From Swiss-Prot:
Induction: Expressed at higher levels in short days (SD=8 hours light/16 hours dark) than in long days (LD=16 hours light/8 hours dark). Slightly induced by long cold exposure (e.g. 40 days at 4 degrees Celsius). One of its GO terms (molecular function) is zinc ion binding. It is found in: Nucleus; Nucleus speckle. Pfam families: fn3, PHD_Oberon, VIN3_C. Accumulates in shoot and root apices, and in leaves. It comes from Arabidopsis thaliana (Mouse-ear cress). Residues 502-602 are annotated as: VIN3-Interacting Domain (VID). Involved in both the vernalization and photoperiod pathways by regulating expression of the related floral repressors FLOWERING LOCUS C (FLC) and FLOWERING LOCUS M (FLM). Together with VIN3, required during vernalization for the modifications of FLC and FLM chromatin that are associated with an epigenetically silenced state (e.g. chromatin modifications, histone deacetylation, and trimethylated H3 'Lys-4' H3K4me3 and 'Lys-27' H3K27me3) and with acquisition of competence to flower. Promotes flowering in short days (SD=8 hours light/16 hours dark). GO terms for biological process: flower development; negative regulation of gene expression, epigenetic; response to cold; short-day photoperiodism; short-day photoperiodism, flowering; vernalization response. SUPFAM superfamilies: Fibronectin type III. This is VIN3-like protein 1. Residues 9-22 have a biased composition (Basic residues).
Length: 602
């Protein structure tokens, strides 16, 4: 009976422990569920501190936990040693002007916020700690005593050396506590004779026993005398402390301007503060004493301009009375960065055409054209160039104007996006097999000359029927080519008289340059180079098809510029050019990017 009862107790104990462990492991999940349930299904605007020994609820707008993390580096110590931290705390029982934040001593040294601090010619803090967050000045004599107590009780040499060195740095250059500093200086000299410089790698990594040092007893005696002497001075150490001057509230932060308001503290009324002086300077610099902003107690809102974007500035405020300087506070602020890429303003100025329709301005039209190559617009540019070649530019614009002046239809059918017809002679097929100009065999821009001659000399009625069925229309003996409008981005149909002349010399066709814009030259050159790379075996047909489709349909202005740069720079080295294009654009051309900018993969 005794053994069975013992087993049952052990089993019950194990079950209880498992339940307890599960309860502790699910604390985070339960906290999240409580956050959801407590808000009626809405998440609370807070997050839980990652420190296992803290687990405090931190407001969402805070970047670090103010309860356990350093206000300078925003990190926490898992095994926190309070003697290695500085805290902004009240010096008196009735002191309410403090923020309560803490920081590592080493972080305070790095930011020059502890020890003997010279704030220009304005103020000099001797043996004090200036809070990194609010600027409140506190004494460090208590922290200095903690270092000597830890040094006296240290059992390892590295710990002893570090604590003595820390106590020496805290009061280095002091005039108020020179007697205490001389005691630590003597202990430091003794240790350096044995282990070398206290801030060197030898002393910091020496894990030897302290009792085996010949000077260990003398160093411990010096620590004891220094601690006793500090206790006598601590009662009068707070007489020269500087209280906080004010609180800062940044109302607006811009790239080159900051608007802030100084919040007055209760001590300002008690001690009859007359006004405030403000210095602002870049982090790491020192302010000039005569360059400050003076403001009274009634006008505490200031706008600071002529700042540099994306720069951290320090704002230092000193309150003054009739007797002189009274309080000191400081705060840091990062100015915002400047947006290089600005969104297109939909309310940009537009020009008005002949019939009163709003047309995009020249700047907007150029930006729209350069953003991507539209196949429909490409066909329009090609026909415009052909009209210039044949001297029919005036007829082209006359027909276009007549088309615009026609009364609009009551309801236009919905336009099919990218529903262009590659059979229309005005729209070239970018993926069609490329034929060099020297082997064109009597064709001009991919259009057989004999077919045009037959169209001019054939039967009028039959040819008109065939032309209309193929998306073209003929009038009299001249073939008037009209696009069906499905591929034109601007949605207009145009007529153009085409009169082809047989060209005996095939090299002349290559000399006809398109003067419409540099965009067409870039596209034409890139297409020729890509086809040339395919014929030479440097790229595959699949990559060529996808690349040209992407380049003409979806590429942005920046991507087009990159491709053009690659082509112009590496044109003499086809292997390097092909490798660069494949490496840079394989993922891009394999991704479908609709016109609305949403990325959808295959």
């Amino acid at each position: 009976m005794d053994s069975s009862s013992t087993k049952s107790k052990i089993s019950h104990s194990r079950k209880t422990n498992k339940k307890s462990n599960k309860k502790h492991e699910s604390n985070g999940k339960q906290q999240q569920q409580q956050d959801v349930d407590g808000g009626g299904g809405c998440l609370r605007s807070s997050w839980i501190c990652k420190n296992a020994s803290c687990r405090a609820n931190v407001p969402k707008e805070d970047s670090f936990c103010k309860r356990c993390s350093c206000c300078v580096c925003h990190n926490f110590d898992e095994n926190k040693d309070p003697s290695l931290w500085l805290v902004c705390e009240p010096e008196k029982s009735d002191d309410v002007e403090f923020c309560g934040l803490s920081c590592h001593i080493e972080c305070a040294f790095r930011e020059v916020k502890v020890g003997v601090i010279a704030l220009g010619n304005l103020m000099k803090l001797d043996g004090c700690f200036c809070c990194y967050s609010c600027g409140k000045v506190s004494q460090i004599l208590g922290c200095w005593k903690k270092q000597l107590v830890a040094a006296k009780e240290a059992r390892r040499r590295d710990g002893l050396c570090y604590r003595i060195d820390l106590g020496y740095r805290l009061l280095n250059g002091t005039s108020r506590f020179s007697e205490l500093h001389e005691i630590v200086r003597a202990a430091k000299s003794m240790l350096e004779d044995e282990v070398g410089p206290l801030d060197g790698p030898t002393a910091r990594t020496d894990r030897g026993i302290v009792s085996r040092l010949p000077v260990a007893a003398n160093v411990q005696e010096l620590c004891t005398s220094a601690i006793k002497k500090a206790g006598e001075l601590s009662a009068n150490a707070g007489r020269d402390l500087v209280p906080a001057a004010c609180r800062f509230h940044f109302e607006d932060i811009a790239p080159k301007q900051v608007t802030l308001r100084l919040i007055e503290l209760p001590s300002a009324v008690e001690y009859d503060v007359k006004g405030y002086k403000l210095w602002y300077f870049k982090k790491g610099e020192m302010p000039e004493d005569d360059l400050f902003v003076d403001c009274s107690r009634t006008e505490r809102r200031m706008v600071i301009s002529d700042l540099e974007p994306c720069t951290e500035y320090t704002f230092r405020v000193v309150s003054y009375t009739e007797a002189g300087i009274f309080g000191h506070s400081n705060a840091m602020c990062f100015t915002k960065s400047v947006e290089i890429l600005k969104p297109v303003d939909g309310k940009e100025k537009r020009t008005i055409d002949l019939v009163g329709n709003a047309q995009p301005s020249d700047r907007e039209e150029k930006s729209s054209i350069s953003s991507r190559f539209q196949i429909g617009q490409l066909g329009k540019y090609v026909q415009l160039a052909e009209a210039q070649e044949e001297g029919l530019l005036e007829a082209f614009y006359n027909v276009d104007t007549e088309k615009i002046c026609e009364p609009p239809e009551e309801e236009l059918p919905p336009r099919r996006p990218h529903g262009f017809d590659l059979n229309v002679v005005s729209v070239p097929d970018l993926n069609e097999e490329f034929t060099p100009p020297d082997s064109s065999g009597g064709e001009d821009n991919g259009v057989p000359l004999n077919s045009l001659a037959e169209a001019d000399g054939g039967d009028h009625d039959d040819n008109c029927d065939d032309a209309v069925s193929n998306g073209r229309r003929k009038n009299n003996n001249d073939c008037l080519v009209i696009s069906d409008g499905s591929g034109d981005d601007t949605g207009f149909d145009f007529l153009m008289t085409r009169k082809r002349k047989a060209i005996s010399d095939s090299n002349d066709s290559e000399n006809h340059e398109c003067d419409s814009s540099s965009i067409d030259d870039t596209l034409e050159k890139c297409v020729k180079v890509i086809r040339w790379l395919e014929r030479e075996g440097h790229i595959k047909t699949t990559f060529r098809v996808r690349f040209l489709t992407w380049f003409s349909m979806s590429s942005t202005a920046q991507e087009q510029s990159v491709v053009s740069t690659f082509v112009q720079t590496l044109e003499d080295d086809p292997g390097s050019l092909a490798g660069q294009l494949v490496d840079a654009f394989t993922d891009v051309v394999s991704t479908k990017r609709p016109n609305n900018g949403v990325m959808t993969s295959h």
